[in-house]
UniProtKB/Swiss-Prot annotation:
Alphabetized Pfam families for the sequence: Chorion_1 (PF01723)
Gene that specifies this protein: ERA.4
Keywords, in A-Z order: Repeat, Signal
GO molecular function, one term: structural constituent of egg chorion
Span list, region Central domain: 58-105
Residues covered by region (Left arm): 24-57
Cellular component, GO annotation: egg chorion
Stretches the record annotates as Right arm: 106-121
Protein role: This protein is one of many from the eggshell of the silk moth.
Signal peptide positions (record): 1-23
Protein name: Chorion class CA protein ERA.4
Family statement: Belongs to the chorion protein family.
Keyword Repeat: yes
């Protein structure tokens, strides 16, 4: 393999990784604005642009996962998670816990994700 082919392959691979990392649950909405509407994706309307489907929409994938934690968890400090995570499911906490602090769980599934719900707190 030549060096230029390897560099091109590496560039394409990194581009795919960056697309997956920085994409959001956008549905068919692309990055286009008023001057870029035909080239990105439609922002409002039925979801189809004049040149076909919006080709630059976010990934918006879905998955099923279970997380189980057992044992003693000595945790101190605070954690903050910001951003949009397309998750539909339930949160459950069971068992005895000696804890001080507060927990806030809030979420929303906006109309771009397909279910059109409003935030709940």
């Amino acid at each position: 393999m030549s060096s230029s082919f390897f560099c091109f392959f590496l560039f394409c691979f990194q581009t795919c990784l960056i697309q997956n990392v920085y994409s959001q649950c956008l549905g068919r909405v692309g990055p286009g604005g008023p001057p870029l509407g035909p080239y990105g994706g439609p922002l409002g309307g039925p979801g189809y642009g004049p040149v076909g489907y919006g080709g630059c929409g976010g990934y918006g994938g879905s998955g099923i996962g279970n997380v189980a934690v057992a044992g003693e968890l000595p945790v101190a400090g605070s954690a903050a998670v910001l951003g949009q995570v397309p998750v539909i499911g339930a949160v459950e906490f069971a068992g005895p816990a000696c804890a001080v602090g507060s927990v806030s769980i809030s979420g929303a599934c906006g109309p771009t994700c397909g279910c059109g719900g409003s935030p709940y707190y």
